[in-house]
């Protein structure tokens, strides 16, 4: 619970409400959504992680700097970072070679398995297994986007709660 206390203290300055929730294990959740810098940072960190889009060179510090400078506001912004090449090269510990490697890694991440993309979105309750099941069932992201609540609950391991999280996303 020490980390929870630290998180609460860090969020007091935002004036956002902190909710305590009890599921299988207790955790806290900021109600600020995309207004909460920790939530935004966490979403991007998850998106670029090895199990998701697997983008090398976009660690927490770099992500934080890019978010702070306004270069990244949503996931799609990562794929136009080429437009900020000079700005990227001016970041601390980020020279031409680092930027070149990062942009190459971003390009490579454009052709990953569908389940990894679904997982990368960070939809609440959708882990790797559920993402695989969704990819196997629907075959394309467009088909998943067009799916109904009823279609979703037919997928292996997806019940009403998870189906609601997906449709709400």
Segments from the language model and where they lie:
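Accessory alpha-helical DNA-binding modules that contact the DNA backbone or grooves
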Residues: 1-169
């Amino acid at each position: 619970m020490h980390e929870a206390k630290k998180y609460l203290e860090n969020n007091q300055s935002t004036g956002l409400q902190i909710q305590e929730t009890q599921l299988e294990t207790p955790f806290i959740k900021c109600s600020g959504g995309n207004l909460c810098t920790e939530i935004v940072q966490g979403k991007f960190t998850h998106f670029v992680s090895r199990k998701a889009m697997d983008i090398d060179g976009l660690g927490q510090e770099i992500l934080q700097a890019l978010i702070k400078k306004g270069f990244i506001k949503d996931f799609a912004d990562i794929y136009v970072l080429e437009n900020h090449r000079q700005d990227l090269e001016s970041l601390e510990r980020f020279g031409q070679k680092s930027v070149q490697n990062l942009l190459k890694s971003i390009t490579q991440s454009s052709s990953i398995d569908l389940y990894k993309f679904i997982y990368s979105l960070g939809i609440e309750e959708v882990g790797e297994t559920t993402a695989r099941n969704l990819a196997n069932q629907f075959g394309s992201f467009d088909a998943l986007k067009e799916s109904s609540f009823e279609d979703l609950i037919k997928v292996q391991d997806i019940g009403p709660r998870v189906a609601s999280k997906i449709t709400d996303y």
